[in-house]
Each structure stands twice: as structure tokens, then as C-alpha cells.
Design a protein with these regions (language model features):
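Flexible, low-complexity junctional segments that flank or bridge functional domains
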Residues: 2-11, 15-243, 249-253, 267, ...
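C-terminal "post-core" interaction segments
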Residues: 30-36, 52, 201-450
């Protein structure tokens, strides 16, 4: 069975995304791919002494282990060990995990809404998904989960830790977390939910300025985003002056979707050649691949600001990197997660498979973001601006408007609108300073383009 779709790696209710390629994803380019680098290493037979050593290990385990062990369990564990010893993103997919993987793009699942990985024997949070129990509770990217309920995660596999987090919707679980900069452990009591993820959210954030948040990259994210842009254009009277694309806490997903999203805002460079979106390099036949822009910029070069943070990973970094390197958008926020590897799902049979790191991806400038991340053009940290008490009226601020019987200005409605907008901006500054900064930059770019 070939997996022809590009599935995000779902750790069931915890929901872990990785960037993956389908086996047939580069079929159109295979004829031009140099596979000479793979021939010597992939066709060489495994040395007989290694096969014998492996067989001896199985024999000793079956004879002397404290209790009888099923052959299937031994082989499953052997495959799992081979994969986990390579890197944090390669893994064995047993029947349950393989099934979860194939159904994960529906956008609905039960759990906490965390993407996690294993680091030094501890579960590390890559990102909490927006509007999920973990996000609402305040769990952050980079947090380390050290206890699940009363059980320590030390010594557990990632799968075992995930299984402990699973449970019936409505049931509770306590997570104990270590956070950088905090000198004591934090505890969070979470209620599991059936999580429905809408990957595209949009609104007019200010007159003439649109806002789109991509929470992940699903199969229909590109199409849904284009429809959202059409709605924003209609809501702005056909004059969309600029767009904020929010990729914060977006753990990634489908490579094809990331390419579609990037392509919507790119076109041809000054020389008339299609702009590069992303390239991948690896040993799998067809994995040396470059994606080029095919269409026309749907915003007709209207200014853009892209928001990223440490929770922006994988496919989200592809989009940010493509728009940054092609100088299509200003990137604002904090450095992204830095996952620059590509995983391919290789079925072993009808029910199991392996998820194997097969390539690294590169931004249009040829830069790998693996363990480095996308560095924003404008660094704006997540800060909380405290709301201060209203200032007393200035006793010297006396004007015509204070005079009894003054003439009424016919533009009072516009003045009221301006005051209301200022109040909205003040509220935005307190609630989401990064978004406030992005809108301020976007408005400045739009004015400069007049």
C-alpha cells in the first residue's frame, strides 16, 4: 500500500505534527533525479555476521528473559529501536499509530492540543495548538513535561508518555512542567476535549487591513486561505491595503499545503523567472526537489507582515522562509523552532510502517533552518503591556469644543470613528503586543507604498 497523501504525524490526542513527503510526491521529477548516491549503500547486503548477531540476541532473549516474549513484540521493538536511534523524528508506526496517521488530516481528535517531542528523556513541548486545552491553560513552546499525573516521564518512550495523556473527553490530567526562567515546577490541571481544528481563521483587523491565522497545514488549508482572502477583499470594499499572516504556534503539517500557501503570494522575480519556494535534498529517489511559484500574487504586491514565534515549526517555517527570502513580506516576532528535516512514511505492510527522515529542506537563499530557525526581520518579544488607570483630564486642555454654544463640526462621525479605532488599537496593544506591532508596521508599509 502506497501512502499517496502527505500526513502529519499525529500522536493521537497530543497531536504531534512533522513535515512529511509522500512516496509519490516527486513522481514528476524522478526522471531527472540523480540516484547514484544511493546505489552503493542501499543495495549492499547486510553482513552475515551482523545478521547472526541479531539472531543470537533474539535467541538469548527468548530463552532467558524473565517471562515469555512474543516474536512479534521482539521484532516490533527491534524496528522501533533502529528508528529512534537515528533522530527525534524517525519512528516505527505500529498498527494503532499507522491508523492514527492516516486519519489525522480530518482536523478532529481528542486530547490536550500539544505537539511534543522527546529531548534528553523528557517530553518537550513544540507548541500548543491554538484554542485547545493546553493553549488556554498557558502551556508554552519550550516547556518540559516532567510528570503526567503522579508518574514521572523519565524512562518513558514518547509513545508511552502520549498514551498517559490520552483519555476520555471530559476527564482530567495534571501536567507538571519545567519552564526556562522559572525556578520552580509548574502544574497545570487540564480537561481533555474533542479538539476540532479550523486551520484558517480570518478577519478585518483595521479598516482596509486583513488578518489571517493559519493554525496548521492541512490538505485544504491553501484552498481555504484563498477563500478567506476573497472574503477579506469583499469586506474591505475591494481595497485590501495589506495583510498580516499569523503563523505563531503553527507546528506545521503538509508540505504540499505549505507550497500552496507560499505560492499564493509569490510570482516571478525581476528577471521574469518563477520565484523559488523551497528545495529539499536527500537520498530518497526524487527527494532532490525544488518547488517554484506557479501563479500570480493574489494580493498584487500589497504589503504583508508574517508573524512567527518559537512555536512556528516545519511547514510554517517553509512559508516564512519563502516570503522572507523573496522579500515578499516582513517577518516579525521571535525566532522559529528550527525543524528543517523532511519525513517520509514508508509502509512495511498493510498495517504498519516507518516514518523516516529522508531529506533536509532549504529556503530560497539556500539556507537550512535545521536547529537554527527563521530569524525575523523585526524582533518583537511576547510581552504584556499592563493596563494603566485612565489619566485625569488636563485642566489646561481648554478648547473651542468646551465653549457653550460652539458650532458643531459635520465631521463628528469621523472623529468618533477615529476615537473608537484608537480604543481598539489600545486594547490590541494590551492583549497581543506582537500583533499590535505587526499592524503598526503594516500600516507604515502601506503609507510608504502610496
Amino acid at each position: 500500500m502506497l501512502i499517496k497523501k502527505l500526513y502529519p504525524c499525529t500522536l493521537a490526542i497530543v497531536y504531534a505534527f512533522t513535515l512529511m513527503l509522500p512516496l509519490t510526491g516527486f513522481a514528476d521529477d524522478e526522471a531527472n533525479t540523480d540516484t547514484s548516491t544511493t546505489s552503493s549503500s542501499t543495495t549492499k547486503a547486510v553482513p552475515l555476521e551482523d545478521v547472526q548477531r541479531f539472531s543470537n540476541a533474539i535467541g538469548e532473549i527468548k530463552k532467558y528473559y524473565v517471562k515469555p516474549v512474543d516474536d512479534k513484540e521482539l521484532f516490533d521493538n527491534a524496528i522501533r529501536g533502529m528508528l529512534t536511534g537515528l533522530d527525534p523524528h524517525s519512528s516505527y508506526l505500529d498498527e494503532e499509530e499507522f491508523k492514527d496517521l492516516q486519519t489525522s488530516t480530518s482536523g478532529e481528535f481528542g486530547g490536550l492540543g500539544l505537539e511534543v517531542t522527546m529531548e534528553d528523556g523528557v517530553v518537550k513541548v513544540v507548541t500548543p495548538l491554538v484554542d485547545t486545552p493546553a493553549f488556554k491553560a498557558g502551556i508554552k513552546s519550550g516547556d518540559y513535561i516532567i510528570k503526567l499525573g503522579k508518574e514521572s516521564v523519565q524512562g518513558l518512550s514518547l509513545k508511552d508518555a502520549v498514551n498517559l495523556m490520552r483519555g476520555k473527553a471530559g476527564s482530567t490530567i495534571q501536567l507538571t512542567i519545567l519552564r526556562k526562567g522559572v525556578n520552580k515546577a509548574l502544574t497545570f490541571d487540564l480537561i481533555r476535549e474533542i479538539i476540532q481544528i479550523k486551520s484558517v481563521q480570518s478577519k478585518i483587523i483595521a479598516p482596509g487591513y486583513g488578518y489571517i491565522r493559519l493554525t496548521q497545514f492541512q490538505a485544504l488549508t491553501g484552498k481555504d486561505m484563498l477563500q478567506a482572502i476573497d472574503r477579506l477583499k469583499q469586506q474591505s470594499g475591494g481595497n485590501l491595503k495589506g495583510l498580516i499572516l499569523d503563523l505563531r504556534n503553527n507546528p506545521g503539517g503538509l508540505l504540499d499545503s505549505a507550497i500552496q500557501v507560499s505560492d499564493a503570494f509569490l510570482g516571478k522575480d525581476k528577471s521574469g523567472k518563477p520565484e523559488t519556494i523551497v528545495s529539499t535534498k536527500g537520498r530518497l529517489p526524487g527527494s532532490d526537489f525544488t518547488a517554484l511559484a506557479k501563479g500570480v500574487d493574489v494580493l498584487h504586491n500589497a504589503p504583508m507582515v508574517v508573524l512567527i514565534n518559537n512555536g512556528s515549526a516545519s511547514a510554517a517555517e517553509i512559508v516564512a522562509g519563502a516570503l522572507k527570502d523573496n522579500k515578499r513580506a516582513v517577518i516579525l516576532g521571535t525566532t522559529s523552532f528550527g525543524k528543517g528535516s523532511v519525513q517520509t512514511v514508508l509502509p512495511l505492510d498493510e498495517k504498519t510502517g516507518i516514518k523516516l527522515t529522508t531529506a533536509l529542506y532549504y529556503t530560497p537563499s539556500g539556507t537550512s533552518i535545521q536547529a537554527q530557525g527563521i530569524v525575523p526581520d523585526i524582533v518583537v518579544n511576547e510581552v504584556e503591556i499592563p493596563k494603566t488607570a485612565a489619566k485625569p483630564a488636563d485642566p489646561t486642555g481648554y478648547s473651542e469644543a468646551n465653549l457653550s454654544g460652539h458650532l458643531i463640526n459635520k465631521n463628528n462621525k469621523e472623529i468618533t470613528k477615529a476615537k473608537n479605532f484608537k480604543a481598539q488599537m489600545d486594547e490590541l496593544m494590551h492583549n497581543d503586543y506582537q500583533l499590535y506591532a505587526a499592524l503598526t508596521v503594516l500600516e507604515g508599509m502601506a503609507l510608504a507604498n502610496r
